[in-house]
Amino acid sequence: MATAREIPLNRTRNIGIMAHIDAGKTTTTERVLYYTGVSHKMGEVHEGSAVMDWMEQEQERGITITSAATTCYWLGMDQQYPKHRINIIDTPGHVDFTIEVERSLRVLDGAVAVFCSVGGVEPQSETVWRQANRYHVPRLGFVNKMDRAGANFLRVVNQVKDRLNANPIPIQLPIGAEEDFKGVIDLIREKAIYWNEADRGRTYELADIPEDMKAEVQKWREKMIEAAAESSEELMDKYLEAGDLSPEQIRQGLRQRTLANEIVPILCGSAFKNKGVQALLDAVIDYLPSPTDVPAIRGEEDDGSEGSRSASDDEPFAALAFKIASDPFVGTLTFFRVYSGILKSGDSVYNPIKGKKERIGRLLQMHSNSREEIKEVRAGDIAAAVGLKTVTTGDTICNQQNIITLEKMDFPEPVISVAIEPKTKADQEKMGVALGKLAQEDPSFRVHTDEESAQTIIEGMGELHLEIIVDRMRREFNVEANVGKPRVAYRETIRRSVEQQGKYIRQTGGRGQYGDVWLRIEPREPGAGFEFENAIVGGVVPREYIPAVEKGVREQMENGIRAGYPVVDVKVTIFEGSYHDVDSSEMAFKIAGSMAFKEGASKADPVLLEPIMKVEVVTPEEYMGDVVGDLNRRRGMIQGMDESPAGKIVDVEVPLAEMFGYATDLRSLSQGRATYTMEFLKYAEAPSNIAEAIIKQQS
């Protein structure tokens, strides 16, 4: 057996820190690294030197884009725990990067949601929260920026309840707020905590609860104890008997309910002012799961049956790659989470999705932007491997004798595209290489060449997403490029069913060509995708030609019906046809299939679909009229309005085509005070006047 593990599994935490853009996530992560002794100099986002944000653009934009994985160690505020390992996966908070968030949530066991005490629960927080619900990730809440004007802890707690439908349980209360924010009350210990400003909060003092807060503390402490008692009959009986629970029992009850996703313990502080992050680290250990607290990961065994791998060094090795990054020093880094078994550098692993074997070269554990070379990595841990060639995001790597494919990640389809061309001949070749690497890192980004115009087209999740790609080409690969106007990814579909024959015959001396099919083409529900059914009876079309027919249909679908955009959400059934003993071939049936689809679809009430975005605008009341008027002009459908401390919230569905340049227009409408977020919602039929204009433009 291998050497024993340095830190037992139950003392490992894999967590993410998720937040809205300005909630202070990067500063919070920074402080975590500082107190756990990783970074000696605290990085500040607004000076652009944060340790986690290691890509240059993030420093310029002050937003976090790439999820870097960082390992640190914590012994507790009072050194009260044995050594724990905390792996932090940094998740971006910007809506164009939800894919990065999905990816990191997939490999986390628990998360800390950071909220701004002033802005509260913002639209973006809701998106990320829903994603975390989907993966059943237990969470803690940290209400940050308690020192800011307008800070209000309990208002944020209520928003977590109302807007996120969660069950927040404060385990701390703030002492003062805004510039009078002094420290926090620990409701479990019933003590006030004041961090020492002289040593940047590394030490603290405990004091009695201020007189004027005792009643409030009593009220919230009771709520917390009731929440803990509800975790088991045993604790409930103790609570009913004694009217109180010991600190150990409270923590035990809260832990159980947090792991079951029944409650969200809420803490508060100001990361920037070095208050509260230390206690947050204790809470990560007290309430968030270790790899042994979460269910075994499921997957598909080599024979197609369902299998699973539990977090143990003794099980066969299995891991999931969740992030590919190009590193200027070592080349391609593949970040992966080990679910079971042990991997040593030099081992060979198998990638079942690509059907390829790879050898693991160096293994690295990342500390934000420094790296430590390690000899082995074990169940429950997160590390990066250097130089894997075939592995892409979402792939499994496993032991070749015990093959398993862990659940695949689903990535959204891009909704926006731009044409891009190199500025000089010298950039031409480099551009291809750069785009290939970036597409390998980011599955929500696609590259293809437009056959007609021979232009290179890049597609992504939003304007910002593509801007950053172009930016990275310039910085990391020294490729200068000219970027065209953004274009919308329209789709086409049909509204009624038709039956259509496609017959291809060529008789020109020697062997001819013969293919004859009848297809039934029917519309499907929006989002249902494409389905092909073979309903041939009695072999009128031999089975070996059926895949060729489907191929012909699929190729024709890519070419569109009226406007040249891909066709979606249709079912095609081949139900009749004929063949010729000598002249029939796959080629002939492929052409027949494509002819039948082309002809049939054009008679089936074809319509153009456009991407509709879910947009949320937050605006001060005085600009409300202008903002709504502008959204109506953009064919927006207002879904609802709401109040928030930051102003009015307008929920609206708007076609993507009308949203280009919206950031600039909104700034000038509201003198820079309104903000918005936008994410893809659905495809919907474009109004006929719009559709006609687009078709005309295409022809």
UniProtKB/Swiss-Prot annotation:
Keywords, alphabetical: Cytoplasm, Elongation factor, GTP-binding, Nucleotide-binding, Protein biosynthesis
GO cellular component: cytosol
Subcellular location: Cytoplasm
Annotated residues for binding of GTP: 19-26, 90-94, 144-147
Domain tr-type G, first and last residues per copy: 10-292
Segments for region (Disordered): 292-312
Single GO MF annotation: GTP binding
Domain of life: Bacteria
Primary location group: cytoplasm
Disulfide bond entries: none
UniProt xrefs under Gene3D superfamilies: 3.30.230.10, 3.30.70.240, Elongation Factor G (Translational Gtpase), domain 3 (3.30.70.870), P-loop containing nucleotide triphosphate hydrolases (3.40.50.300), Translation factors (2.40.30.10)
GO biological process annotation, one example: ribosome disassembly
Recorded family membership: Belongs to the TRAFAC class translation factor GTPase superfamily. Classic translation factor GTPase family. EF-G/EF-2 subfamily.
PANTHER family named in the record: RIBOSOME-RELEASING FACTOR 2, MITOCHONDRIAL, TRANSLATION ELONGATION FACTOR G-RELATED
Function: Catalyzes the GTP-dependent ribosomal translocation step during translation elongation. During this step, the ribosome changes from the pre-translocational (PRE) to the post-translocational (POST) state as the newly formed A-site-bound peptidyl-tRNA and P-site-bound deacylated tRNA move to the P and E sites, respectively. Catalyzes the coordinated movement of the two tRNA molecules, the mRNA and conformational changes in the ribosome.
Record protein name field: Elongation factor G
Organism of origin: Coxiella burnetii (strain RSA 493 / Nine Mile phase I)
Gene this protein is translated from: fusA
